[in-house]
Design a protein with these regions (language model features):
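Membrane topogenic/interface segments and analogous intrinsically disordered interaction regions
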Residues: 1-247
Length: 247
C-alpha cells in the first residue's frame, strides 16, 4: 500500500481537527433541520385531524387571541414533524459521534440510539393514547353547574406536549439503569435494596415532570415509572449475568 493510500485513511486513534468537527456538526444540523422542515410540511394536512382527535375528551376548544388558532396549527405541525423526523435526526447524531469511536463502541452506540428512540416513542404513544384522554376526563369531572370548562387550544396543546414529552423521557429509565450498570456505577442488588427509597423518588419525579398540579396525573406517571424501575432491575441482572459469563 503506497503512502497516498495510507494518508487517505486516517487511523482511529488520530485526533480529528476541530474545524473538521465543526464542519461535520454544521452539516448534520442542516440535514436535521431540513428533515424536520420537510416532515412538518408533510404532516400539516393532518393537523386538523389531530386537533379533532385531541378535542374528543373536552368537546370544543376556544382561542382567546386573533393569532392563537393560527400559531397553534403551526406549533402542532412542528412537533408532529419533529417526532416524524426523529429517526433522521438520531441518524445524524449517530453519524457525527461515530467518527471518533472504535468498532465495538460504534456497535454499542448504534444499539443505544435505536433503543432510546423505541423507548421514547413507546412512552409518548402511551401518554397520547391512554394517559391524556383518561386524565383529562378525570379532571373535567370536577366541573359543576357553576364551573364550566372553557379550554384554550394553545394551553391544552401545551399540556399535551408536556405530558407526551415527559412520558417519553421517563420511559428511558431502563436504558439509563442499564448504562450505569454497564459502566459499573450501579448494581442490581443496590436497586433491589433501595426499592423503597426509589419509590419515594419516583413519586417526587412524577410530581415535578407532570405539567398539571393534580395528583391523578402524577399517579398516572408514577405507576409506569415503578414498572420501568422493575424492568431496569431485570436489565441490570441480565448485564451482570453476561459479564460473569464473559469472565
Amino acid at each position: 500500500m503506497d503512502t497516498a493510500t495510507k494518508n487517505s485513511h486516517p487511523r482511529l486513534d488520530e485526533p480529528i481537527p476541530l474545524l473538521s468537527h465543526l464542519d461535520e456538526l454544521k452539516k448534520r444540523l442542516i440535514y436535521s433541520l431540513i428533515a424536520i422542515a420537510v416532515c412538518s410540511f408533510a404532516v400539516y394536512p393532518a393537523v386538523d385531524f389531530v386537533i379533532r382527535d385531541l378535542a374528543k375528551p373536552v368537546g370544543k376548544f376556544i382561542f382567546t387571541g386573533p393569532v392563537e388558532a393560527f400559531w397553534t396549527r403551526f406549533k402542532l405541525a412542528f412537533f408532529m414533524g419533529l417526532f416524524a423526523a426523529m429517526p433522521v435526526v438520531l441518524f445524524q447524531v449517530w453519524s457525527f459521534i461515530q467518527r471518533g469511536l472504535m468498532p465495538k463502541e460504534k456497535h454499542m452506540t448504534r444499539a443505544i440510539t435505536v433503543i432510546s428512540f423505541v423507548l421514547f416513542a413507546a412512552g409518548a404513544s402511551f401518554s397520547y393514547f391512554l394517559i391524556v384522554p383518561v386524565g383529562v376526563k378525570f379532571l373535567l369531572a370536577y366541573g359543576s353547574d357553576v364551573m364550566v370548562p372553557m379550554i384554550s387550544v394553545s394551553r391544552y396543546l401545551s399540556f399535551v406536549f408536556g405530558m407526551v414529552f415527559s412520558f417519553g423521557l421517563v420511559f428511558e429509565l431502563p436504558l439509563i439503569i442499564g448504562f450505569l450498570v454497564k459502566l459499573g456505577m450501579l448494581q442490581s442488588a443496590t436497586l433491589r435494596k433501595q426499592r423503597r427509597f426509589a419509590i419515594v423518588i419516583i413519586f417526587i419525579a412524577a410530581a415535578a415532570l407532570t405539567p398539571g398540579p393534580d395528583v391523578f396525573s402524577q399517579v398516572l406517571m408514577a405507576l409506569p415509572l415503578l414498572v420501568l424501575y422493575e424492568a431496569g432491575i431485570i436489565v441490570a441482572r441480565m448485564i451482570e449475568k453476561r459479564r460473569k459469563q464473559n469472565g
